[in-house]
Structures are given as structure tokens and as C-alpha cells.
Amino acid sequence: MKTYKNRIYDAILRDALEAKGAVLIEGAKWCGKTTTAEQIAQSVIYVNDPKQLKQNLVTAQTNPQRLLAGANPRLIDEWQIVPEIWDAIRFDVDHSDGDGKYILTGSAVPIDDEAKRKIRHSGTGRFAWIRMRPMSLFESLESSGSVSFADLFAGKGTLGDAKQHTLEEMAYLTCRGGWPRATDKSGKAALRQAFDYVDAIVNTDISRVDSVLRDPDLSIRIMKSLARLQGTQASVSAIKADLAPNAPNAVHENTVYSYVGALKKMFVVEDMPAWCPNLRCKTPVRTTDTRYFTDPSIATAALGLGPDGLMDDLKTFGFLFETLVARDLRTYAAANDGKVSHYRDKSGLECDAVMHLRDGRYGLIEVKIGGEALIADGLKKLNRLASEIDTKTMKEPAFRMIVVAEGEYAYEESDGTLICPIGCLKP
């Protein structure tokens, strides 16, 4: 029997169950939602179990309360297949005592018109939402955790050794991704998981998510385009233009929008929103989201790249390393009840990531694969942005950090900026 690797989301789920009657865990397929929920659940129904699926569909329409019978917390896996159950849960939570009754997991949102008609209430006040992602390096035991974001925000952060990874090893981790199944394997078997994942998306899932038939060939071409545009604020028209050289027929922007929208509904794409701070100057802030997959291995698999391919193309590696860091930062932020955004203004000043908490504390983060010149560029950007922030109306940044791929330990520059290998971070 496989040993369960503790997830950062274990504590997030427990806290949510203490606060609400039901918790919805959303996230990409294979990221570990069901397994994590099973650690806490006292009973479970697998809606898509082939032996029970037909019966579950009928029961959801005729007597949805029957599907709720069982010890609490009760896990309802792939709940979006029977959206009628949503209102049944809301009603039960309203008319019973106690929190932490239900856990719902799903790899897609029920977004077609028929499913929407089956959900009459939003769930506000009864449900808590958790967005789960593939494993961070700390969860897959590939980060020492010597630098804690919680400590940095508390003003007591200490710097320590990193779990050392060579650039070649980081290329492997980027291609392998944080899929729990992949972290239990090694070599080719581990790398294959992302390729199988992308195959499933383009051949079945992207059409199944909203019952719209989509072309597998165009699906993979759009995913390749998104992979080439990771870490950019590319518009739908820019994606269309990227497709043009390899497209036998013109692709309409509405078609691109539909395909990208389907990928978002499956949590395959998770764009990063813009951060809009109060600035001393009046430079307009860009509000376009930054394009990211939920895991860097989706990009490498879509492009047909392995670790050697990344090492032969360090520019692409740099962009996809940024996707890996974005994945980890989002999980570390979630553990601190925070979020991650990006900053870019009309003058070209940008910051790859801003981790911000609900109480107004925030940290500025640049991502660089490594090298003195790139680190110097990151220092310049961070210091310039910090100097532009109006500290009369906002707090000063709790920290400034550059995340790099390699390094034996984290250290502090003379200006106070932290240089941290990705292999030393934790929540």
C-alpha cells in the first residue's frame, strides 16, 4: 500500500470544515483531491463508480438526500456529475446542527446550461471553496523548508540550507511535475504521467467538460501555444497569431476563446491576476492576467519536451521554471490565507509575483533561473517597484525575494533582498 504524503491542503481542509457545513475542493484531475479528502472523510460515495453510476444519476434526480446518507464528514467525489446534490447539501446544512458535514471534490465545474438549471442556490455562507494544485516541492519532499513564508510575514524569518538541485535535476522536476502519482515513480515512468495527462485532455476531457465537441489536433496546438506563452500577458488574439504559422485553416478568435475557456473549467489553465497597488506616481497599471498552466509539466508535455530539451533551450526553461514557482507560491500562499498576483505597468516595470495576505501584508518576488546578470536585473526591478509604492496608504513590503533554481542555501543581499533557491521554501 502506498504511503500517503502529507499535503499542505490537509490543514487547509480541516480549517475549512471547522468553519463551514460543506467544503468544495476544486482542481485539476490527478492533483490529489480525492486522496486528500479520504484522509479526513468518515464515509464516501464515488459518483462515477461504473457499478453505481446509473443508479447515482437516477437517485440524484429522484431522492438526492439518499446520496448524503453516511457518517460525516461525507465525501462526495466528482459531485459535478450529479449537480442536483448541491441544493440538497445546502438544504441539509441549513436545517441541521454542526459544521464539517460534507466534502465535495471535482475536476471540473458544472458549466453547461442544463447543469446550471439544476443548481438554484449559490451556496454562499454554507460552502467553503478550496483550489487544490499539484504537489509543491515541499510536499513532494524536494524542498528543505528552511525558509518559511509565515515567518517572513511575521518578521522573524531565518535563512537556511536548501535541498540542493542541479539545473539538470530542476529540468527533470519541471517535466515531471507535481502529480502525486509521478512523485511516487522515477525516470521515464514519472515523466510519462504528464504526457498521459495531456493526451487525456485533448482526446476526451476537453470535449466532455461542457459537452462541446472539440478537435484534438486544434486542442494540442492551442495547448502548445499556451506553453510557448507561459508567464506572458498574451491575449486571445496573440494566441491566434501564434497558431497561424502552423494552422492549415484560419482559427477564429471565438474558437480560441472556447478552447482556452474549457481548459480553465478543467483547472488545467490557471492564469494569475494583476496586482494594483497604490503608487506615488500615476503610471497606469496593466490589469491583464498572466498565462500559466496549473503545473509546468503540462507545458513540457504539450511541447513534447523532456529534461534534455529544456537544457538545450534555457530561455524556454526559464519561462517554465517560472510556471513551477507560480504553482508552489500559490500553494504556500493558500496555507497563509493569501493569494499570488503579478505586477506590470505601462512603463514596463514588472514583478513576477506578489504574495499578499488579507490583512494587507505582502511580499515582492522575482523568479530567475539563475546567473549573476539575471539576479542583478531582479534586484533592480524589486527595488524600483518598492520605491514606487505609496507607503502612506500601504504597508511596506514584508520582504523582497528572488527565487532561483540552484543554490546550497538562501542568503540576504546588502539591500535586504532574499535570494532563495526553490528547494528551501515552505509555507
Where are these regions (language model features)?
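N-terminal pre-Walker A segment at the start of P-loop NTPase domains
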Residues: 1-14
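Hydrophobic anchor at the beta1->P-loop junction of P-loop NTPases
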Residues: 25
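Conserved lysine of the Walker
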Residues: 33-34
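Short glycine-rich substrate-engagement loop in P-loop NTPases that contacts/grips substrate
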Residues: 45-73
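Conserved catalytic/switch belt of AAA+ P-loop NTPases
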Residues: 86-110
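Interdomain motor-coupling "hinge/lid" segment immediately C-terminal to the ATP-binding subdomain
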Residues: 112-232
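Accessory nucleic acid-recognition modules appended to NTPase machines
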Residues: 187-361
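Domain-level recognition of nuclease-like catalytic cores that cleave nucleotide substrates
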Residues: 405-427
